[in-house]
Regions:
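Conserved P-loop NTPase motor core
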Residues: 1-191
Length: 191
């Protein structure tokens, strides 16, 4: 699976990826700027906006990053310095564990990083039909926040996940709960 993600990242770094359009591609093209439909072809662009700024994908996993992804998948803490590619490394175990459709929490220290990492990596996940969203776009009482938790992958900051968990445990009615699944989590800045 990691080789598949690495190859997709490599293809994105070289340019747009063209595939036969599926219903999922049509849906994504209506919602996001990184997919375009031309006839029966879906074009996944290697450039899109991240936090309102134009961004071009230019990252490919190094062997050391693949090893980091394996360690994270098996539950080990992995220390990486600034600039060593934590966001890229996290794509590997996130992708692998999202294949079960049981939910993957990507937990960051602030809403900026949650949104940035989501917007940077979502084409990589969505190219394979995985759903992804970020809870930081919606407040606790917005129905879209509950829908976000139904995604295969959801990004958010640690305090948001914590408070959603606590509120769910004091909810009077089941429909007031927003969290759905607790399967796998990646925590950025564990310290």
């Amino acid at each position: 699976v990691y080789a598949l993600v690495k190859e997709t990242a490599r293809r994105f770094s070289l340019g747009n990826i063209e595939v036969k359009a599926t219903s999922n591609d049509l849906y994504l093209a209506e919602k996001y700027d990184f997919v375009e439909i031309l006839g029966e072809t879906a074009i996944y662009k290697n450039h899109w906006d991240v936090m309102g700024v134009p961004y071009s994908w230019n990252m490919v996993h190094y062997d050391e990053q693949l090893l980091g992804g394996i360690l994270l998948h098996y539950g080990y803490a992995t220390e990486m310095a600034t600039g060593e590619g934590k966001t890229l490394v996290a794509t590997l175990p996130v992708f692998l564990n999202a294949l079960s459709h049981e939910g993957v929490h990507v937990i960051t220290v602030n809403d900026y990083l949650s949104k940035r990492d989501f917007e940077t990596t979502r084409p990589l996940y969505m190219f394979y039909g995985l759903s992804a969203d970020c809870i930081e776009y919606y407040n606790r009482y917005d129905r879209r926040r509950k829908e976000t938790y139904k995604s295969d992958i959801f990004f958010g900051m640690h305090s948001s996940f914590t408070f959603d968990y606590l509120y769910d445990h004091i909810a009077i009615k089941p429909e007031e709960c927003v969290q759905q699944k607790h399967n796998y989590a990646i925590i950025d800045e564990l310290d």
